[in-house]
Curated annotation (Swiss-Prot):
The keyword Translocase does not apply. Monomer. It comes from Bartonella quintana (strain Toulouse) (Rochalimaea quintana). This is Peptidyl-tRNA hydrolase. The record marks D91 as: Stabilizes the basic form of H active site to accept a proton. The gene is pth. Keywords: Cytoplasm, Hydrolase, RNA-binding, tRNA-binding. It is an enzyme of class 3 (hydrolase). The record marks N9 as: Discriminates between blocked and unblocked aminoacyl-tRNA.
Length: 193
């Protein structure tokens, strides 16, 4: 059994923010597979289905980004899931737009959602970090992450979301290198800034 969590902030005013790319990926996965209707429990929106024959829960914490670990911790404990079967998808300022990095464990790199998960759940889980680019100045970070993706961002964002959804089974199978290579190939001809 697997848990895939996308990080973001709840509410219509945040749905197109760069910070919500994790929620966007979860929605793309949800649309690509047969998942149950969303239900609200564990301070989250949660759905379950099968990905490549593996029972999988999708979760979008509704606690706001900085408290994501509360909701995720509840789900992990309730279903008695091991961290090795947990994948979190989040935005990453320090990667160029559309770039993907996958790793297990490590630091939070200043990401408050990851910091919350680490505090509530531990650190030994798979992190899929999706580049949203850095605005260049620390003073502009808050405005950048809470800013909406632009029309030109859709040139790389839509293919990225689609490629991740179609290839998420590779991560569940444990083939991180092939996952990253496949995503890179699917988005390499897109206009990344």
């Amino acid at each position: 059994m697997w848990l895939i969590a996308g990080l973001g902030n709840p509410g219509l005013q945040y749905q197109n923010n760069r910070h919500n790319i994790g929620f966007m990926v979860i929605d793309a996965i949800y649309q690509s597979f047969s998942f149950s209707p969303w239900s609200k429990k564990f301070q989250a929106e949660i759905s379950n289905g099968l990905i490549d024959g593996e029972k999988t829960f999708l979760i979008k914490p509704q606690t706001f980004m900085n408290l994501s670990g509360q909701a995720i911790g509840e789900v992990l404990r309730f279903y008695k899931l091991d961290l090795k079967n947990f994948i979190v998808i989040c935005d990453e300022l320090d990667l160029p737009p559309g770039k993907v990095r996958v790793k297990t464990a490590g630091g939070n790199n200043g990401h408050n959602g990851i910091k919350s998960i680490d505090a509530h759940c531990g650190t030994d889980y798979c992190r899929v970090r999706l580049g949203i680019g850095h605005p260049g100045s620390k003073e502009l970070v808050h405005q950048h992450v809470l800013g909406n993706f632009t029309k030109s961002d859709q040139e790389w964002l839509s293919p990225l979301l689609d490629a991740i959804a179609k290839n998420i089974a590779l991560l569940i199978k444990g083939d991180r290198c092939l996952f990253m290579d496949t995503i890179s190939q699917a988005t390499k001809n897109k206009n990344l800034q």
